[in-house]
Amino acid sequence: MAEKKDVEINSRADTLDLMHPDIRPWPVTPPPSPEEVAKVYARRKAEDFGKWCEDNLKYEYCFGKPEALQGMRFVCVGLWRLGNKFAGGLLCEAGAEVINIEPPEGDPLRQLTPFGRKEYMLESKITGEKCGLDFIHEMRGQKSVTLNLETEEGKEIYKKLIGMSDAVIDEMPAGYMDSLGLGYRHLSNEFPRLVYCNVAVRGTWGPYKDKTSKFGQWTLEPFGGCANAFVHNTGFPQDQLPRESGGSPTRSGVWFADFVAGEQTANTILAALYWRDEFTGEGQFCEVTGAETQMDILDFDISWYGFNASIKARTGAWDPNLNQYEWNPCRDGYMMIGGQTDRLWYRIGMCIERDFPQFGRLIHEDPILKEMGGRNALEMLIKTYTLTTRWLRDINRIEAEEKLLEYEIAAG
């Protein structure tokens, strides 16, 4: 067996000789070849579907019916981030006109594609330029303009555009727009009705605001996901996934901090516009941070720390707050079971008891299991999850799902 050792990752080249399963820093799944992808596309008639989309989902169709935000215009400015684009997409879906400002060389996000595979990119019929699918997806319904904000001409054009807009979504590094004379404190003097929302990972005024590269491109998940326990409690406990000192945490599979921040940015802007149009007639500066928005959705984690100053431990597939709510392995895969209510809990017991009488006896013999608060104790979770796992390991996914759904249990 290869020697296990700590790995300091500096570049892809540094890790090429570390890809042995026992020492590689991450599981690498090779992407399918272009030939394999072409076969799947042909089988699914992907080209026909693409043509249908081009004919039926044209941009001009966006305004074919009255929309809630029709007539409103928003300006987005930001590089290497999806938050401003996700927020713009939500506003655009409600009928607004959203204009993204890109530098002359374009937003670097245009170049992102899985494993650097150019065949996963779309090519413009007009310019021949290739663009990653994720950028196109997040830019749905929006417009892009090229503008160099670091030139006097670019600044003047930007101000004219702001004068015709309702709100700005700014996801540039803290202080960057101010350094150009284009921040809220500058624009609000000329446009007092302007709503200006900054969306960032670390905010615009705290002690961490300046700890970022020029456009903040490598801080999204590392800070937004790690500073608030999101990454820490996502993964398996130490005894289930040993790696020298214990189990490894797991990052979100998507740029979670930016998407949540983008959603709250859209909500924040709508609230500010309502306040302006219904009450004061004045705009305002708003701020959304990726780290804080993830704190909002950490359910029990904040209170967990507040009650006993402990950080919630990793529990893998089990939810420590509900009995049962987990996925567990079965004979040919995995099965998710949700039993968060008394009704579902007892139905789980009735279902498993048919094949596994021990589960039913456990419920009858231990009165603590009959009450939600009691059965969520660690000892009770271990008892019931252990029996559920034993039941699942002897049946396949189809059998498990059919039996659980027969009792109207949330499963799949």
Regions flagged by a language model, labelled:
Residues 2-279:
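N-terminal helix-loop segment corresponding to the beta1-alpha1 unit
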Residues 74-75, 282-291, 361-366:
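Beta-strand segments within the central parallel beta-sheet cores of soluble alpha/beta enzyme folds
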Residues 105, 201-203, 290-295, 332, ...:
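Glycine-rich beta-alpha junction loops
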Residues 218, 267, 272-316:
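Substrate-binding/catalytic subdomain of NAD(P)-dependent oxidoreductase enzymes
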Residues 232-238, 271-279, 293, 299-300, ...:
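Generic secondary-structure signature for well-ordered alpha-helical cores
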Residues 249-260, 283, 315-316, 323-325, ...:
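A short glycine-threonine-serine/GTX helix/turn-capping micro-motif
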Residues 308-325, 398:
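Active-site Gly/Thr loop motif
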Residues 324-411:
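Aromatic-enriched alpha-helical interface/lid elements that frame and gate functional surfaces
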